[in-house]
Amino acid sequence: MLKSNKVVLIGAGGVGSSFAYALTIDNSLVHELVIIDVNENKAKGEVMDLNHGQMFLKKNINVLFGTYKDCANADIVVITAGLNQKPGETRLDLVDKNSKIFKDIITNVVSSGFDGIFVVASNPVDIMTYVTMKYSKFPIHKVIGTGTILDTSRLRYFLSDHFNVNTQNIHSYIMGEHGDSSFATWDETKIAMKPLSEYLAEGKITELELDEIHKKVVNAAYEVIKLKGATYYAIGLGIKNIVNAIIGDQNVILPISSYINGQYGGLIKDIYIGAPAIVCKEGVKEVLNFKISPKELDKFNSSANQLKSYIDKMEF
């Protein structure tokens, strides 16, 4: 049960501040946003900057600088803290560094008395979501990662650009790791009510073009990092959507880091990985176990095994 429509953000870097900004300009539900960062001056500066724009908002939100004590009565704790991916690094290169940072963060949050929902955005997000669940000992439905929400948004953007239709009419997902081993659910993709297979048959898109689109999705982060140093606007919007889905009890389907334990053929167990799930005020209401093609299932298992190889080396 939601208590106060209060969100605590841990991490005032590019991703965290982008989420905070997105939340303030598109807010109808959150009453209070508290920002925590190891760099207290950075957090205080973000709070000041956001508050100075209150006159321009449709609905004011109380933005405050805080400490871990402020997590006690929060509904949601969003974690964007941790080291960022550098040029040439994969997200999985950050496992050891960020898992150590997370142990301290999660311990402090839980010690405050927090019993709400964790939303994790730090990379590698699927593993960091699992780490959060293990360190917090929270029920799996109360620990959510951003998963492939950004990958899916990128996919729908590229498809909408190709077909010249609104992204809202593109129905497709990226599943698996938020990273290089992800895959697109082409066999289940529809443009409005029309299956992608029909567009292929009509010659309006080719298998080669689909492969190129998926490559663009996978390489998007590397390209943005090369050009501007980091990605943060789009994922900030994605986090905002997850938070609003929880606060607003939207029961919306989002491709998040979902806890998989036997779904999708039974081979994937005890892991968080990108898969569509219903998100509501309780966190994850249900991880959808829809049918995907054997080829896609093989890719899902392969992606999960890659993540599992890192998790199995960790001690909790």
Swiss-Prot record:
**Protein's UniProt keywords contain Transmembrane:** no
The answer to whether UniProt assigns keyword Phosphoprotein to this entry is yes
Residue numbers of Phosphotyrosine PTMs: Y222
Q: Where does substrate bind?
A: Q85, R91, N123, P124, V125, D126, D151, T152, S153, R154, T231
Main subcellular location of this protein, as a coarse class: cytoplasm
BP-aspect Gene Ontology terms: glycolytic process; lactate metabolic process
* Pathway given in the UniProt record: Fermentation; pyruvate fermentation to lactate; (S)-lactate from pyruvate: step 1/1
Residues reported to bind NAD(+): V15, D37, K42, Y68, G82, L83, A121, S122, N123, T146
- List the active site: H178
Disulfide bond entries: none
Give the matching InterPro entries. Answer: L-lactate/malate_DH, L-lactate_DH, L-lactate_DH_AS, Lactate/malate_DH_C, Lactate/malate_DH_N, Lactate_DH/Glyco_Ohase_4_C, NAD(P)-bd_dom_sf
Q: Where in the cell is it found?
A: Cytoplasm
- NCBIfam families attached here? L-LDH-NAD, PRK00066.1
Return the protein name: L-lactate dehydrogenase
UniProt source species? Borreliella burgdorferi (strain ATCC 35210 / DSM 4680 / CIP 102532 / B31)
